[in-house]
Amino acid sequence: MDLIDKKILGELQRNAKQNTKEIATKVGLTVTPTYERIKKLEQKGVIKSYVTLLDRDLIGKQIIAFCQITLYKHQRSLLDSFKESILTFDEVMECHNVSGNFDFLLKVAVNDMNKFQEFINDKLSVVEGISTIQSSFVMTSFKDTTSYNL
């Protein structure tokens, strides 16, 4: 990946709705080589998908929580079962296997505290293998980005 590819990726991260001509102008290429570079980045998997970022407040996701999950045993079957369960939960925006004092960190988005309690009681707490769940709630966000510095 060269500097031009990084510029193209930067432009797409800023606004994926731009057309190839706009991107080409900004990175100093013509349309055809810009298009070909974008296609190559897609084929290599560097560009995974194009998404629309939503304003969580305007769609009613008022509560963001980070749940720290500890499993009682690190057995392959329990890990696989845990992962399968988490993938079915629409409330879970992110799930990371981490090192440290707990095993997994979940980012959860729900409409209100009642929905969060339902999620914990009816879904998360019944997942086999979980020994502890600790939750922290976002009060204010100072930085929330999806862009990587290239």
Where are these predicted regions, by residue range?
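A compositional/biophysical signature of low hydrophobicity enriched in polar/charged and small residues
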Residues: 1-150
